[in-house]
Amino acid sequence: PDIVMSGGDVESEYPEDLPVPGASVVYAPSLNANMYRPISVKYSSAYPPISSWTTGNTRIIAYMDGYKPAIKTLKAYQESVNKYGSSTTLPKQAATGRFYTKKIDGRWWLVDPEGCLHLERSATSLRKGTSSRNKAAWNSRFGTDEKWLSTTQRELSEIGFHGTGAFCTGTYSLIQIHNASNPGSPLTLAPSFAFLSQFKSEKSYNYPGGSDDNAAGLVFYNGWAEWCDSYLAGSAFADYLRDPNVLGFCSDNEINFSSNSSRILDRFLAINSSNDPAYVAAKGFMDSKGVQSVTDALNNEFAGIVAEKYYKAVKEAVMKVDDKLLYLGTRLHGTPKYMEGVMRAAGKYCDVISINYYSRWSPELTTAIADWASWADKPFLVSEFYTKGVEDSDLNNQSGAGYSVPTQNERAYAYQHFTLGLLEAKNCIGWHWFKYQDDDGTDNSSKPANKGLYDNSYQLFPYLSFFARELNFNAYDLIQYFDK
């Protein structure tokens, strides 16, 4: 569909093909009793061709009873936020020159370097595509890094995205150059690292039991905490320390603290070397309990011990080099984000708990998200989520954790639906869409997928952009609506 997003002070109109909603019902799962008229959206966890779709009730702003968007133009949005996309109308907080977290009236917030309340809305993987058409389009549209990043910053900010997340490989330093040259229009950074594999290679260790599934067991190996100290004090972090445009950092990605089919305690006990430190830790834990058989409760407790040893070393190392640098955790995914022991450990040492949130059509407001608030008492950031359109994409879409949906229209509705749920959560301080640009070519072992805000010609997807913009522009107003 043709979507034209008006600029300046011209209001954008809803597209004519907006789905017809059902009758008004109470939105669920929710902590509130807000009414809405649901639209039906098809989705699937399978790769195409999709033989069976699930249909989910979906909430979009257009059909929320009792809510009308406060901000309808780019001009109005730009007048309501600062250069970070933070609110200039909500109560000002102490300005420290850095990002920090604060709980106000039961809701967690980020506070930006200027003291403005900030909801994080960014995109991961801001980097140049490697396919031949990526390269041709980049050269045609930009030609220089400076033009690429200044154009990208402007276009993203004009739909309410103001920064970057993990996996901006080769781009972080370019972003910092852009930020230095354009102090009034920065892109925030939230770089990701791979502490465990780096520790392993620098120490010439093998993975416990020879399996990277057991990478977390490296925290029991000699020198883990000391290595964290030296790594954070070294060249890998030098550029990020004391940079006001750095939101924070993630030290690893999706550590396997357990999965549905594989408990960490079972795995460590199965290591066939009785001298392996991970085995010794697991055996010592079982001996201390006086038991022979692993239970889910014991596994949860042990996973928490492993996670605490991991997070404690990283956080203490951070405090030695830059005590104002926010530690965003390890992008928890799958089973680990539902494990009380892991979440309690993360809450003890992380400033923000990053979560890659997949396999749920709606945020779990009354269950998992409430648990995170109770267990961790720290805010969470959704560090990955997306859907991929499989019927109007030129990619094979044979990879990726995000749901398949039919077209770009459903991607747009899914964005609003999921983020509206996140805005209801008083412990959520924002989200990072995965990702900046579609896969292409040989990405994901030649299984590229439609994940991007941008297509492979560096053009924003119009329908997704329209609905993301409406939500992002009104995010602060929506928080007031949900909190009233």
Specify the residue positions occupied by each region the protein language model found:
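Active-site clefts of carbohydrate-active enzymes
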Residues: 203-215, 376-415
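Conserved, mostly hydrophobic/aromatic
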Residues: 115, 249, 318, 353, ...
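Aromatic- and acidic-residue-enriched segments that line the glycan-binding/catalytic groove
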Residues: 176-213, 244, 251-287, 441-456
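Polysaccharide-binding and catalytic clefts of secreted carbohydrate-active enzymes
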Residues: 113, 211-219, 239-341
